[in-house]
Amino acid sequence: MVIRSLLQCRTWSKSDWLLASIGIVLIVYSFSLSFNSTSDSIPSVDRSDLVKLKLSSKAKERGAFCLDGSLPGYHFHKGSGSGSNSWLLYLEGGGGCRTIESCSARAMTRLGSSNFFEHEVPFFGVLSSDPSQNPDFFNWNRVMIRYCDGACFSGHPEAEFKNETRLFFRGQLIWEAIMDELLSMGMSHAKRAMLTGCSAGGLSTLIHCDYFRDHLPKDATVKCVSDGGYILNVLDVLGNPTMGSFFHDVVTLQSVDKSLDQNCVAKMEPSKCMFPQESLKNIRTPVFLVNTAYDYWQIQNGLVPDSPDLDERWKICRLNIQECDAAQMKVLHGFRSSLIDAIGEFHVNKEGGMFINSCNSHCQIRESWHSATSTRIENKTIAESVGDWYFNRKPVKLIDCPYPCNASC
């Protein structure tokens, strides 16, 4: 209102100019806050850990595009010394889209278009180059692959014709194009490699784990770490298959079934094969699971999704576990039990590893990887646990006690 009233004046005084300047600064500041909502969760990093964006040079020839048709990209930090022939790929997360409308909206954000990617991103946690923060992988070649397809790097272009849309469903082609590019940059000679990612990136890690293994030297040590990617296929508190319906719609919309294990797809409804409880049965490559048994993303989107039919107590509890009453905590403990039961078969897998804590969090291998304040189980951080498992220093099958027993959360 201040600026509008001033614009209606023919001549401005010094005080008018001052008010206008203040107004413009406030507007710009408010926009910067709205577009930087994750800054509080990012630790301070050295300038050397700010890594520039590179758009894929292989994407166009492969027909690999983000939802809006822009080129996909990644951030690459070259390895050094003993890590020169070791590679760590991190798949960015960010949910997914199940309808033409939601994918169209997503195409106008950084999760659907490289036009909105940051030109530099901080590498911290599992991507850090600081040995005190990342003791086992700090000097590896480290890559963050940006997520812009809305279907876990697994969509196929056939779906575009089926749905008569101008959107590009090319997640699988994005994955293949960037893999080709990294292989040409030296990854084809890797001695050690690890594929990882969080949330949708953690789910993508499981989907593409064997592809990653199969495209690297046979004598290389190749393993996969899924963070926050073990999504449960359970009914919500109202008895609805919320997460199952979501996966079904994503798989159907973007023809994701073509990227899933075909033996599984032949036996059951394809979207069920996207859930880790099924997909893990068919993965040949060693896998490590990092998950919290009280994953707030799964609670808010799968177990207790926002709904007009939800009573007020659940509306409060779903957003803050500390506000949950005894009856609600019983439901959340039941959710934990469902996870423990689901990973029962994987628990006896000799090559597998796990770090299942009881924090009310989601992504952890960047935010809570290895520091004085990091989450621990049996006094081990996630970084120490993954390192012990990857380098075969010791078996790692860590499952936390129920919430709120872990003081390190």
UniProtKB/Swiss-Prot annotation:
Keywords: Cell wall, Cell wall biogenesis/degradation, Glycoprotein, Hydrolase, Secreted, Signal. Pfam families: PAE. One of its GO terms (biological process) is cell wall organization. InterPro entries: AB_hydrolase_fold, PAE/NOTUM. Residues 1-32 form the signal peptide. The keyword Plastid does not apply. PANTHER family: NOTUM-RELATED (PTHR21562), PECTIN ACETYLESTERASE 4 (PTHR21562:SF83). Belongs to the pectinacetylesterase family. This is Pectin acetylesterase 4. The lineage of its organism: Eukaryota, Viridiplantae, Streptophyta, Embryophyta, Tracheophyta.
